C-alpha cells in the first residue's frame, strides 16, 4: 500500500522561491509506485493551501518569477485530530491521513524549528532534523559556539545585535580583513556582504539588519569551498566531497539560484584522498554534535595548510536542479528517487522510535 506523503513548500522567508524550485524537483522525482502525494503550499502571508499537481506553480521554469498559483484551497490545522490534522476550510472536509511530511520550506519558519515544532504538535512524522537541531543550525552564532566548544574549527567571529554599536575599527582590531557580515538566521547567502573598508562595513550592517536582528561578523578565510552531504539518523553516512568554485567574490544568492554559470561545481572535489576522508569525518562529527537527523549539508573552507574549517551546517538543504545535496549523493551512487525514499524511511523510523518513549509516568 502506498504511503501518503505531504510535500510542504513555499513559506514566508526570503527563500520562498528557492523552496518552490526544491518542491518541483522532489515532486517530479519521487517514486509514484510507492508514494501518494498531497501538495501543500504556504504562501507569503503564511496561509496553508492544498494544490492539485496540475496547476500549483506559475512561471515554473523561471527562478526569478516562479510563484504559487492562485488555485490553492486553504487549510486549517487541527492538533490532536488523529488522521485528520489537515482540514479544508471551505468544505470542512479533512484531507486523507498523512503518513509523513516532507518539509521543503527553507529559511525562517521552515528550517529554524518552527515548522518542526508544529509538526510535532500535529503528531505527524517528518523528514529532517527535529526542533532543537533545526533551531541551533539555523542560528549561525549558536552553531559556531556549539562546534567550537566541541573542538571543531570555525572561523573567528563576532556577534552584533540590533541596538548595539560596533565600529569598523573595533571589528578590524579583532578580525582580519576581509570580513563577512551575515544575518545570523538567514540562508542562501541572503543579506551577506563582503567588507574591506569602513564605508562597506556601514552598508553591510544596514543590509544585514534588514533581514535579522542579530548579525554574525566573520573573518574571511582564504580556502577552497568544500561541501559534504550527510544522510541518516543514529548511523549516518557521508557523501563524497564536492567543491564550489565561484567566479564572483563569494557564493552569493544570485550565483546559487539565478546565474548558475557564475560558479563551477566539482564533484568529487579534487582533494587528496586522505584530506577528503578527514573532511568527511569532521562532517559526521558536526552532524552528531548538533543533534542532526535525516539529512544535512556541511559546508567547509579547506586552506592550503590543510586546515578544515566549518562554515555552516544546513539541516534542510536545497533540492533545486543545481543544488549540491542531491548532486553529492548522485555522485556517491544514490539516485534522486532513492535519496527521497531513504529520507522518508528515515523519518518513519525516527517516528516509530519516538512512539516507544513513555509520556505518562502513571501509565
Swiss-Prot record:
Q: How the cofactor binds, per note?
A: Binds 2 magnesium or manganese ions per subunit.
InterPro entries, alphabetized: ATP-grasp, ATP_grasp_subdomain_1, D-Ala_lig_Van_CS, D_ala_D_ala, Dala_Dala_lig_C, Dala_Dala_lig_N, PreATP-grasp_dom_sf
The entry marks the following residues as binding Mg(2+) 1, namely 299, 312
Q: Where is the ATP-grasp domain?
A: 144-345
**Needs which cofactor?**
Mg(2+); Mn(2+)
The UniProt entry's sequence similarity note says:
Belongs to the D-alanine--D-alanine ligase family.
Record-listed Mg(2+) 2 binding positions: 312, 314
Q: Could you tell me the superkingdom of the organism this chain comes from?
A: Bacteria
Q: Which organism is it from?
A: Pseudomonas syringae pv. tomato (strain ATCC BAA-871 / DC3000)
Q: What is this protein called?
A: D-alanine--D-alanine ligase A
Q: Name one GO cellular component term.
A: cytosol
Function recorded in the entry: Cell wall formation.
State the PANTHER family in the record: D-ALANINE--D-ALANINE LIGASE, D-ALANINE--D-ALANINE LIGASE A
Q: Where does ATP bind?
A: 172-227
Amino acid at each position: 500500500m502506498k504511503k501518503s506523503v505531504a510535500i510542504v513548500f513555499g513559506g514566508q522567508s526570503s527563500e520562498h522561491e528557492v523552496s518552490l524550485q526544491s518542491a518541483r524537483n522532489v515532486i517530479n522525482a519521487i517514486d509514484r509506485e510507492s508514494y501518494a502525494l498531497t501538495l501543500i503550499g504556504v504562501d507569503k502571508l503564511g496561509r496553508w493551501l492544498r494544490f492539485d499537481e496540475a496547476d500549483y506553480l506559475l512561471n515554473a521554469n523561471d527562478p526569478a518569477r516562479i510563484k504559487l498559483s492562485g488555485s490553492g484551497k486553504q487549510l486549517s490545522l487541527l492538533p490532536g485530530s488523529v488522521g485528520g490534522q489537515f482540514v479544508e476550510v471551505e468544505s470542512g472536509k479533512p484531507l486523507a491521513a498523512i503518513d509523513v511530511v516532507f518539509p521543503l520550506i527553507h529559511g525562517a519558519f521552515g528550517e529554524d524549528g518552527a515548522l518542526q515544532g508544529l509538526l510535532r504538535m500535529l503528531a505527524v512524522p517528518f523528514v529532517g532534523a527535529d526542533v532543537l537541531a533545526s533551531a541551533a543550525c539555523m542560528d549561525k552564532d549558536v552553531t559556531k559556539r556549539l562546534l567550537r566548544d566541541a573542538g571543531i574549527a570555525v572561523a573567528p567571529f563576532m556577534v552584533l545585535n540590533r541596538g548595539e554599536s560596533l565600529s569598523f575599527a573595533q571589528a578590524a582590531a579583532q578580525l582580519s580583513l576581509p570580513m563577512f557580515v551575515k544575518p545570523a538566521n538567514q540562508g542562501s547567502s541572503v543579506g551577506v556582504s563582503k567588507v574591506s573598508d569602513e564605508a562597506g562595513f556601514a552598508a553591510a550592517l544596514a543590509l544585514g539588519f534588514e533581514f535579522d536582528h542579530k548579525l554574525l561578523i566573520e573573518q574571511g578565510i582564504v580556502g577552497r569551498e568544500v561541501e559534504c552531504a550527510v544522510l541518516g539518523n543514529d548511523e549516518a553516512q557521508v557523501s563524497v566531497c564536492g567543491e564550489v568554485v565561484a567566479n564572483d567574490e563569494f557564493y552569493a544568492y544570485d550565483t546559487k539560484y539565478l546565474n548558475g554559470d557564475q560558479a563551477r561545481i566539482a564533484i568529487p572535489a579534487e582533494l587528496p584522498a586522505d584530506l577528503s576522508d578527514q573532511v568527511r569525518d569532521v562532517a559526521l562529527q558536526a552532524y552528531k554534535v548538533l543533534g542532526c537527523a535525516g539529512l544535512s549539508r556541511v559546508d567547509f573552507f579547506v586552506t592550503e595548510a590543510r586546515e578544515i574549517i566549518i562554515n555552516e551546517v544546513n539541516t534542510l538543504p536545497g533540492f533545486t536542479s543545481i543544488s549540491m545535496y542531491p548532486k553529492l549523493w548522485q555522485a556517491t551512487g544514490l539516485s534522486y528517487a532513492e535519496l527521497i525514499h531513504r529520507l522518508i524511511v528515515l523519518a518513519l523510523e525516527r517516528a516509530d522510535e519516538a512512539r516507544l518513549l513513555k509520556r505518562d509516568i502513571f501509565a
